[in-house]
Amino acid sequence: MGEVNIAPLGDRIIVKPIEREVMKSGIIIPDTAKEKPMEGEVVAAGPGKLGEKGERAPMDVKKGDKVLYGKYSGTEVKINDKNYLIMHQDDVLGIIK
C-alpha cells in the first residue's frame, strides 16, 4: 500500500496532516501554540460506502488529493511513527486544486 499498511473500510480515508511550521511573515510557531492542521494529503481511501442494495457509492476523494477538513475531524492514529487522521469522506470540506 506504500506509506501506510492499513486499508480503510467503507467511506473512510487516511489523511497525512500538512504542518505549517513557518508563517508567511517568517515567524516560527512553537509546538505549544499550534492549532491542529486543517489541510492534509489523502494517503489511502476506502472502496466507498456500501448502499442498501449492496452497491458501492463512488468516493469523491482519492489517494494523493490535498484536502481541507474540520479542525476536530477524524481520529488521530500513529502509523510507522508518523501522525495520521482516519476520517469519513463526509468530514472533508473540499479538495484543493
Curated annotation (Swiss-Prot):
Pfam families: Cpn10. SUPFAM superfamilies: GroES-like. It is found in: Cytoplasm. InterPro entries: Chaperonin_GroES, Chaperonin_GroES_sf, Chaprnonin_Cpn10_CS, GroES-like_sf. GO terms for biological process: chaperone cofactor-dependent protein refolding. The keyword Zinc does not apply. GO terms for molecular function: ATP binding; metal ion binding; protein folding chaperone; protein-folding chaperone binding; unfolded protein binding. It comes from the Bacteria. GO terms for cellular component: cytoplasm. Keywords: Chaperone, Cytoplasm. The keyword Chaperone applies. Heptamer of 7 subunits arranged in a ring. Interacts with the chaperonin GroEL. Belongs to the GroES chaperonin family. Together with the chaperonin GroEL, plays an essential role in assisting protein folding. The GroEL-GroES system forms a nano-cage that allows encapsulation of the non-native substrate proteins and provides a physical environment optimized to promote and accelerate protein folding. GroES binds to the apical surface of the GroEL ring, thereby capping the opening of the GroEL channel. This is Co-chaperonin GroES. It comes from Elusimicrobium minutum (strain Pei191). The gene is groES.
